[in-house]
Each structure stands twice: as C-alpha cells, then as structure tokens.
Amino acid sequence: MIVAATGFFDGVHSGHRMVIDKAVALAKENNGKSIIVTFWPHPRNVLQLDADKLRLLSSLEEKRQRVLACGVDEFVVLPFTRDFSGLTASEFLSRYLIGRYGVTHLVLGYDHHLGSDDVRDVDQRDRIVRMCGIVPVPVSDSISASGRAVSSTMIREILSKGDVVLGGSLLGYRYALDGVVVSGQRIGRTIGFPTANLSLYEPLKLIPAGGVYVVCVTVLGKTHLGICNIGTRPTLGDGRGQIVETHILDFDEEIYGLDLRIEFISRLRDEQKFDSLEDLKKQLKKDLSAARKFEI
C-alpha cells in the first residue's frame, strides 16, 4: 500500500496536518509507505494570477521540514510549469501518482481539487480517482473558532492584520521569518538599542502587519527574547522602505552575515512616529519591559 496526499501545503497548517497525519497513519496500519507530493513554485506565479500580490507562509525548505516532521516516508516536489498546469485530473493521477509512485490510496481534504478540469465536486472527484484505480480517502476539514475552515488564505489574512497569536494558533506553531543579518545605519546603537536587520531568504514570504512585536530569536544556535519592529521607521524618515529589525535582549555579539530566525510571540503596538530619538528611546524601554513578561 502506498498512501499519498497532494497539494501546495503552504504553511503546513493544522488543516494540512489532518490530511498528512491520515496518510501517515493509514500507511503504518497497513505496513505501507506514505508520500506527500507538492509543487513549486506556486501556481499563481507561473500562471500570473495576481502574482505580484502573492505572499507565502512557508519557503520550500520550511515546508519540507514540517512535512517530514509529521513522519512522512517520502516528500516529493514536482516542478509546476504551464505544461503541468494543463494536466487533467485523470492525467495527473495516471501519469504521476500511479505511473511514477505507484500510489494506491489518495487522502483528500475537504477543498481538494484536481487537475486543469478543476474538479471540486466531492462525488465527481472521488469517482475520477476510483476510475484511475486509486482508493480515495476523505478527511473532514479543520474548523477554526470562528466556524470557518482553516486555510492558508485565512491565515495570511490574519497575519497581514498583525494577529500573530491567532495566526500561530491556526498554524499550530509560531509564525517565523528566516534570513541573514545585514548592515543597517546603526542608529539603534546610539540610543542603546542595537538592532539586527533581516534580509529574508524567501522573498515572497509574508511579513506580518507593521508594528512592534515580541519575538523569539534564534542565532548562533541559541534562543533569546527580542522586540521586532516591522515598518518604515517614521521617526528617522530615511525613506528605506519596509524593514524588519530586531533588538535581541541581553545580547551583544557581532552577527552580521549570520543566519537569524525570528518567531512571533505577540504584538505590542503599532509603529509610531516620535518627535525625537529620546522619545523613541523611552518607548523602547517600555517595550523592553513588556517583552520580558513573555517566555521564549
């Protein structure tokens, strides 16, 4: 028995994991193999469907790590191209799932649609799967507290409003940004609050709404509390555009050029414009005091 699940799985959120966990459990119960088949890049990028507005919850590497952490036996990435997008449901099932991977069972979430024929009706979808010689295995949807089915789109909307607590709850883990520390103007150092400026590894990664957040920072193999500012630094008026800068509590090491990860714990406030650097410093001290109440 080879049990598969397919999809983009952006964020590998709680709804995705219900599907993945079902595939893993079914395979183990029958001494079979579980396989997750995903795609890269995002279809909207390839098909130019509002591609300029697309933001992702996870990079390909983040997705791989989170899927494999569920106990999946094999993680497969298929290149998403225009030719690939033209495959019908039956062509995809026959050519790839059966032809390449010998899939016998396919776990399907509530909103899973297949192929260029965009089969969304559950009965019709399952009928096509059976006709191709695969057993469909349905999984009910994961419901949020608001009564809506959990989806990547929902979580993107929530994070875009700055609610990292709810976003993290639906993901099942703290939302995070990964990148390399790059040189800034070092103005923070002059007021006693040096910051690490982050250049993201995944340029399409969604950045939460502008504001100041309590974060967990991982650098040099250790974790620390931090306060992260996302925005345009209106007090400085330097016109640098959106930046992600983080002050790491009780930390004073040179980390330019190093990997850095920030996990969002809670939002403290909106970004503000202050009359002077001294006023900014006073507010940062308040932010620091508030951040210390949180645990990593």
Indicate residue ranges for each PLM-predicted region:
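N-terminal Rossmann-like or analogous alpha/beta NTP/dinucleotide-binding catalytic cores
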Residues: 45-132
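Residue-level signal for inorganic ion chemistry
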Residues: 13, 67, 106, 167, ...
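N-terminal catalytic cores of NTP/NDP-binding nucleotidyl/phosphoryl-transfer enzymes
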Residues: 1-59
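Generic structural signal for residues in well-ordered beta-strands
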Residues: 75, 136-137, 262
